[in-house]
């Protein structure tokens, strides 16, 4: 897409929102309570603030304000307001390619925000525990928040990721013509590294004419040892391992497809 000469400020709003899910199996109620306490500590407001502050550093944004809160009995939320440093729009990379990792600082944001909310929970009797984090990066200006995606996926390793990217509003060029998007995009997947793409099954649902893009990701690799809390596979019988594996895979597939599957 050729460079646009705008009349005034770039008024497009670009928002990336995604949910990440982490699944585990905890056999007893005490283990499930311990998992909730563990994940609540691992992703408390202070830790989330560090992650989001690092995100701001990566994309070159100035932090204006931080609001954070831990909740009782569990969960946390952090919202950071950020602003853009002075920059030349011709230096901005809006091409469809993966964003930076922590060692590559190349972007800026405008009057924008980054926020995260966490939701740990457990099945009342089935041993399944899940942790969900909702993250949103919203920008006004020339920069796409998709440049923060690659870092966050690496930072928050997950079993399932669902993402939505949307561009709202319009900006006007010097001739008065309205533009409803200022960069080319065919899929959110194009902003991920090949390494990430190789690790996940992915599915797109895009509405191009509405500038709405949706991608789901489900981890390909399944190792039971990675999903057990306070236990190891060696402590389980073959029948128990098969049953727990079935429960975990069913839970992962249900969350990925967004529907409950029949019990077999």
Swiss-Prot record:
| Record's cofactor remark | Binds 1 pyruvoyl group covalently per subunit.
Q: List the disulfide bonds.
A: none
**GO CC aspect terms:** cytosol
Which residue numbers mark the site Cleavage (non-hydrolytic)? 111-112
What the entry says about post-translational processing?
Answer: Is synthesized initially as an inactive proenzyme. Formation of the active enzyme involves a self-maturation process in which the active site pyruvoyl group is generated from an internal serine residue via an autocatalytic post-translational modification. Two non-identical subunits are generated from the proenzyme in this reaction, and the pyruvate is formed at the N-terminus of the alpha chain, which is derived from the carboxyl end of the proenzyme.
Which pathway does the protein contribute to? Amine and polyamine biosynthesis; S-adenosylmethioninamine biosynthesis; S-adenosylmethioninamine from S-adenosyl-L-methionine: step 1/1
Tell me what reaction this enzyme catalyses.
S-adenosyl-L-methionine + H(+) = S-adenosyl 3-(methylsulfanyl)propylamine + CO2
Q: What broad class of enzyme is this?
A: lyase
Domain of life of the source? Bacteria
* MF terms (GO), sorted A to Z: adenosylmethionine decarboxylase activity
Q: Which family does it belong to?
A: Belongs to the prokaryotic AdoMetDC family. Type 2 subfamily.
Q: List the protein's name.
A: S-adenosylmethionine decarboxylase proenzyme
Q: Which organism is it from?
A: Photorhabdus laumondii subsp. laumondii (strain DSM 15139 / CIP 105565 / TT01)
């Amino acid at each position: 897409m050729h460079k646009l000469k705008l009349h005034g400020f770039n008024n497009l709003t670009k928002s990336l929102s995604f949910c990440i899910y982490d699944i585990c199996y905890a056999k007893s109620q005490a283990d499930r309570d311990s998992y909730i306490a563990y994940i609540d500590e691992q992703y408390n407001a202070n830790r989330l603030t560090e992650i989001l502050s690092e995100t701001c550093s990566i994309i070159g944004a100035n932090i204006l304000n931080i609001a954070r809160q831990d909740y009782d009995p569990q969960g946390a939320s952090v919202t950071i307001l950020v602003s853009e440093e002075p920059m030349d729009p011709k230096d901005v990379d809006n091409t469809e390619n993966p964003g930076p990792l922590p060692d590559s600082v190349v972007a800026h944001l405008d009057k924008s925000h980054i926020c995260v909310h966490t939701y740990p929970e457990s099945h009342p009797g089935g041993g399944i525990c899940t942790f969900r984090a909702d993250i949103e990066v919203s920008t006004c200006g020339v920069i796409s928040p998709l440049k923060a995606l690659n870092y966050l996926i690496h930072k928050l390793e997950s079993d399932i990721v669902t993402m939505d990217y949307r561009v709202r509003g319009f900006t006007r060029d010097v001739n008065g013509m309205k533009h409803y998007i200022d960069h080319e995009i065919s899929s959110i997947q194009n902003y991920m590294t090949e390494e990430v793409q190789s690790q996940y099954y992915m599915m797109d649902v895009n509405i191009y004419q509405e500038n709405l893009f949706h991608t789901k990701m489900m981890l390909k690799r399944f190792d039971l040892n990675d999903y057990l809390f306070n236990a190891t596979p060696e402590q389980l019988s073959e029948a128990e391992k098969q049953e727990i594996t079935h429960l975990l895979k069913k839970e992962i597939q249900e969350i990925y497809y967004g529907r409950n599957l029949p019990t077999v």
